[in-house]
Amino acid sequence: MSEAIASKEERLVAYNANIAAADKDPSLSPETGKPLSKVNTIRFGAGFLVFGILWMSGLGIVSAVLLPMHYKTIEGADPDALVGIVNAFTAVASLVSNLMFGNFSDRSRSRFGRRTPWIVFGAVLGGVTLFLTGTTHNAVLLTIFYCACMFGLNCMIAPLVAVLSDRVPSGIRGTMSAFYGAGSTIGAPIGTMIGAFFIENLTVGFAVAGVLMFLGGIVAVIILPKERSADFLPKEEGSFKDILVSFRPPKFAGAHDFYKAFAGRFCMLMSYQMINVYQLYIIQNYIGQSVKESAVTVSVVSMIMMVMSLVGSFISGPVSDLI
């Protein structure tokens, strides 16, 4: 029976049956209960790859190059101190928004699916506020816009990452994760190289960054196979208190792998960002290069990082599926 004429009850039964079948057979999609076609496999891989490249390129333009330069234009501000203050606020915004939008998308029951509307909304919010970050010379407004950008970014990331468990067979999730990881890893140095090109034209650079982040969510939705309607799923019952409780992290006793992955990723990103965020200041203030010289150095370093990231990402995904 086609989805168009099936009742909501029949669609719910089929939905649960598909998930049960996929739990037993790693080649089956939890969404359809069938193996992915070659075309859809390619579309998932391409969608995750392009999404990672675009949003990370947009953010990389700003975080690694343009924003450190922009801090120097704010009268009376200490750029070094401002980097730490703004990043502290955006770190909190990222943590809260990732949990929040992941939870909200789980509870969505849209005819466009649970994830798609949030990805589109996040693309608009993230792109617009990333551009606005470069239009103000007020430290408070800048922090507000940049935090809003983190909300938009995580409004895309949390639902899109959930697509892996919602729609992709477990047997190829490692490979698909590698496509996303490769995209975001490649996107960072690409963004830095683009940012170096606009190091003396900040406003245009911020506009390009905003467009790239916006396109990240929109293009991903277009490339990925169309998400099925979620209007047949039963609504999540509960009070506001129940919603708050749902944000609680899992207990350590039953989630060892979660906390191992969390700790590993936290340490990896912290060590990377310790250098990346202050990279431009290190090159200009410690090494002593001019603005134009530092742009060339940033581009060369980014090219090296991109090549090595490509090699690592495309090896790790398939290997993880075999283990």
Residue ranges and their predicted role:
Residues 148-183:
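Cytoplasmic helix-loop-helix junction between adjacent transmembrane helices
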Residues 98-112, 312-323:
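Helix-to-loop junctions at the C-terminal end of transmembrane segments
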Residues 26-91, 259-264, 268-288:
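Helix-loop boundary and gating motifs at the non-cytosolic
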Residues 90-95, 174-197:
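Glycine-rich segments within core transmembrane alpha-helices of 12-TM secondary carriers
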Residues 91-95, 99, 188-189, 306-314:
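Residue-level signature of mid-helix packing/kink "hotspots" within the transmembrane helices
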Residues 121, 204-222:
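Symmetry-related core transmembrane helices of the 12-TM Major Facilitator Superfamily/SLC fold
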Residues 120-137:
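C-terminal ends and interior cores of transmembrane alpha-helices
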Residues 3, 9-42, 227-263:
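Juxtamembrane intracellular "pre-TM" segments in multi-pass secondary transporters
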